[in-house]
Amino acid sequence: MPRQLLSGTVLLGAAFLLAGSTSGSKLKVPVLSVNGRQHVVQAGQTLNLTCRGEMLHSWSLPEALSKDSKRLNVTKYACGRNGTQFCSTLTLSRTQANDTGRYSCRYPTSPVKKKRESIVYVFINDTSNPFVEMHSDIPKIIHMTVGKEMIIPCRVTAPNIAVTLKKIPRETLIPDGKTIIWDNMRGFRIPEATYRFIGLLSCETTIGGHKYSTKYLTHRETNTIFDIKLSTPRLVKLLKGDSLAINCTVKAAWNTRVQMTWTYPGEAMKRGSVTQRIDQKNREANVFYSILVIDKVRDIDKGQYACHVKSGPSNKLVNTTVIVYDKRFINLKRRRKTMLEAVAGRKSYRLPMKVKAFPSPEVTWLKDGLPAAEKCARYMVKNYSLIIKDVAEEDAGNYTIILSLRQWNLSKNLTVTLKVNVKPQIYENAVSSFPDPNLYLLSSKQVLTCTVYGIPPPKITWMWYPCRQNHSKTRRGFCSRTDGSFNLKTGSNIGNRIQSIIERTAIIEGKNKTASTLVVAEAKSSGIYSCVASNKVGKAERNVSFLVTDVPSGFHISLEKVPIEGENLVLSCSANKFMYKDISWILPRTVTNQTKARKALNKEYSITLTLTIRNVSLAHSGTYTCRARNIFTGKEVLQKKDVSIRAQEAPALLRQLMDQTVNTSNSAMLECQVHGIPEPQITWFKNHEEIQQESGIILGPGSRMLFIERVKEEDEGLYQCIATNLKGSVESTAYVTVQGTVERSNLELITLTCTCVAATLFWLLLTLFIRKLKRPYFSETKTNHYLSIIMDPDEVPLDEQCECLPYDASKWEIARERLKLGKSLGHGAFGKVVQASAFGIKKSPTCRIVAVKMLKEGATASEYKALMTELKILIHIGHHLNIVNLLGACTKNGGPLMVIVEYCKYGNLSNYLKSKRNFFSPTKDPSLQGELMKDKKGIEPVEGKKQRLASVTSSESFASSGFQEDKSLSDAEEDEEDAAELYKLPLTMEDLISYSFQVARGMEFLSSRKCIHRDLAARNILLSENNVVKICDFGLARDIYKNPDYVRKGDARLPLKWMAPESIFDKIYNTKSDVWSYGVLLWEIFSLGASPYPGVQIDEDFCSKLKEGTRMRAPEQATEEIYQIMLDCWRSNPNERPWFSELVKRLGDLLQASVQQEGKDYIPLDTIFTAESGFPPASDPLCNEKFPVPSPNCRSTERARYINTFKIKPPQRIKTFEELPIKEKLVFNDYQADSGMVLASEELKRFTWTGSKQKWTLFGMKGVSRSKESGLSGITKPRSFCSFSCDQLSESKRRYTYGNTVLEKMKACHSPPPDYSSVVHYSQPSI
């Protein structure tokens, strides 16, 4: 910028006077002593410039020339005529190159608006310094803005110097007068700068062969502000006297200059101090900081604090609010009402609280008294709110927020209740998401059920959609929902008459479920029944395709009669019209062109296609197939009929007529026994005259019999029968002689008639009485989980319910000729179990040993239905490794009904454990096992069997039993030898835990299939190959209270020792009652087959103590962990007992710890454990990695124990039964044997939960207990069943007598054979 030199004060007064005198005239521009716009002076010379003007004036000099320079001198004086003008002379001695620039003379003020000045540009010519400013080493920064003018100030010291502009490294910028303009007074001028000029520029010139250059670096300015933020939150809470520090941080682009300022309440009083700094270490942006600090805040400092940032046209601000409190406090209020509601399935739900506190308190949320965040990983505490992720039904409860300032002893808490509403769920939909359409027999009574759960309890509505036929080409006959629907009520006659709609509610698995039962009185119309369950959060719908059929099974071939050659063959193929279409016949190759198939007859419920073949011959025998297409699946379905044409045969006498002598008034009968094809026509003759049927003469069916009532003398004569058909005729004769008189009294006839009438009435009454006695009673717990709360047993019989379960003959039917029945394995009330060899099980070409359940001879129809019901239930349950699985059945006519299940050759677990009492070892002894394995060549070691079982994966659990090792006949013969070898092996703690774990897995599966066992005990656990145990007798549909075959069939009793209290007193059976029984089963296992409650009299006192919480002591071989599991299973409150899934996990952990302590993994169970649970096997490399949370298969075994070397003391709050001391004549009840059947249902009716204080004896006669503990507890060893060896007993043959009953210890010591040694009862509890 040019500098101004003010004039001296000597002439100041005169100047103002003169200015006043000339104010009225126009001033002239000051005049310089040099002419032109530029003037050249050689370097080192003196520059003289004189300015003459009409006013006092001043000089403006180049920026590099200082006014204080000693080389500069300005002289001011009056000049002109009479001194009326002002002159000043500027003298600059020893001029230099940087003195080059603009020199101007101007008036300091002007009476007119327009300024007046005279300018001359002076060049100081210096050949050694051609540029006024030299920047050779460090370039000068030039700020540029794209699109605006930019000056590159490479000014020269002489007007005629040629300058070249270059952009380093190689580009030369040539002035073109437009984009680049050269000005020797200013340098290079660029009117509109672009990105082209960004970079390092150089001005170059050459003088006297020497090259000179000066460099400039262009700098593009921006106004980009990336981010602005404060170090404090939007709301800052402080206590009086606290310090406040707010840091305002700005991120801006490179080449951006920012200006940061603060506005705050104490700004006027300068309450705060501000410090600023810049951080250019960031490669992406410059970071600017402005920090406002107030040492001790007061009330005046509360308010809004704002940080303002400006860069060119860009303006931004960020603010925060500061609140100053006088003291610390907590205020807590609800934002909403006390009862909050959420919907299950919601992704997130917030429990809000209105909190005002200082300072911020510690926040704790409790759910039902326990820390919420620890209780569930889905709970998150954010600020003062609790956020529940993926809301579930179990999230309902009481939530308490606790705010505390422990340092100052301040706290507040508030509780709200969360209700989780659940959309209606229909459990039948869960069982079958896409149910196949059901066929219902015409005029039959049908029951439809809908089991619903929801919160609040849903309203259930039944709708009816009549069928309409969709006449499209591809789905003709398909029954689809119509637009019109009808609301159904009891007594509705729309479509089908509704007999009743009943709703029942029950608590199942802790949920209050409602079941609605729709009873269709008579199936007449096809359509869709829709069960709609709705509440305020949603609705669910279940559609049941109700297709009425007059054809058995919906697709059937009927044959009018067995054809004879020469007759017509008529076959009718009928199919339900809503299920099938495109019916056609497939004929044997031998059938010729005389075949005639009529056009399909479309009836109300079905389509019938009749096939007629006239004048058939033997060649027409064969298989006739009717083909139809299933409308729903699109698959072709075939129905076959084997037709055998019978050849014609001439009549032949099977027996000749015999001469008879008949008394008068008696009756005579002649029978013409002939055979022929076709059936011969029989004609009777007397004395060669044809006999016609008339009063007193009766011709039997087909005229085969001739019956003469009250024979007379004239009936005597020669009787002849002639049998004739197309092939010929045959005859036979006999003479009937009549003797005696006709003098008889009519009293004989009257007496005979009355006797017949009386006998008929007596027989009718006897028949009705017997049928009433055999009428089945039905329980309140049915075969299906859904039926358990649905049907009134008196209203819908069990067999009718189970008729709804399907039986797929193509999958399960096995020809009887493929079975070779063997020895008997057991028997029940009306059935028996036999061993059999089966060929072709699951299409295998080899033989397999199986167990076959069948009825005894003389079984009734109801018993047949019961076994058929069991078959259907077993199919419904499915397959699992640890249950006795169904393999097939024989149901077709022509033989007995047989249910084929897996054969477990080692018998039941109870007998097996008893046989191993003398061979129990806590750990495995490899040397002992090796010795036993050497005794028989070719026997696979136990470890080898486990390795073989490792190939069994859980993927087969629903398709097979887990064992695909079908045996040949030679293998079957070695079963007993293999069983004997198993009895030689010692029993270990690992085996006991393994049995417990497997039973828990099997029960977990059964409970998942909604199956309740109700008689879970060691006698109902069978031992199979590879130490695999299987649960049996779980699929029997029978009510133990109402069925007379079970309750009072001889001395059969209820399994009281294994029953839960709620089952004993209230007859409640569910999964949790099975858990109780499982705890008793654990006691049996770890007592090595002992009878539960040893030495305890099973009477009312026992039941009362059981209700009060008295439990069994720990068995001898149980560890603390095992006994704790038993106590958990025996909790009085069923809801507090663990689920079977929890028991599987706990026992799986114990089993894994047990086997790993021996340095190996349990291969069979580990395989199953890995496939189903997702845990890695212990041999998996993943186990070698460091997991933050240990896997059950990778955990340490340091805490594992095998044997209870000391007496386990139960918790003090658990009372245990004390064993009764043995007295000389102590007699125990006979019903404490291992069969476990005690107390008939009539006696159970006397018990209630409140109990009776009066003690009375349940049994009048007492017998000897066959259990170790009850009969021999005082004289036997703790581990051995016998105090003597079997050899010693055989020599001494000692017998111990109690009362009148003798217990042979020889039998007690003898190991049972590898067979089913217990009775298999069919009359078991239902699921």
Swiss-Prot record:
Listed Low complexity bias regions: 951-961
Protein kinase domain mapped to chain residues: 819-1151
Active site as annotated: 1015
Residues reported to bind ATP: 825-833, 853
Xref: Pfam families: I-set, ig, Ig_3, Ig_VEGFR-1-like_5th, PK_Tyr_Ser-Thr, VEGFR-1-like_Ig-like, VEGFR-2_TMD, VEGFR1-3_N_Ig-like
GO biological process terms on file: cell differentiation; cell migration; chemotaxis; positive regulation of cell migration; positive regulation of cell population proliferation; positive regulation of MAPK cascade; sprouting angiogenesis; vascular endothelial growth factor receptor signaling pathway
UniProt-annotated stretches for the region Disordered: 950-971
GO terms for MF: ATP binding; growth factor binding; vascular endothelial growth factor receptor activity
InterPro entries per UniProt: Ig-like_dom, Ig-like_dom_sf, Ig-like_fold, Ig_I-set, Ig_sub, Ig_sub2, Immunoglobulin_dom, Kinase-like_dom_sf
Domain Ig-like C2-type residue range list: 30-121, 120-222, 227-323, 331-417, 424-545, 552-644, 651-737
Residues the record lists as Phosphotyrosine modifications: 1046, 1162, 1202, 1231, 1316, 1322
Disulfide-bonded cysteines: 51-105, 154-203, 248-307, 450-531, 573-626, 672-721
One GO cellular component, as annotated: receptor complex
Superkingdom of this protein's organism: Eukaryota
Record keyword Magnesium present: no
Post-translation changes: Autophosphorylated on tyrosine residues upon ligand binding.
The family this protein is said to belong to: Belongs to the protein kinase superfamily. Tyr protein kinase family. CSF-1/PDGF receptor subfamily.
Stated name of the protein: Vascular endothelial growth factor receptor 1
Organism lineage: Eukaryota, Metazoa, Chordata, Craniata, Vertebrata
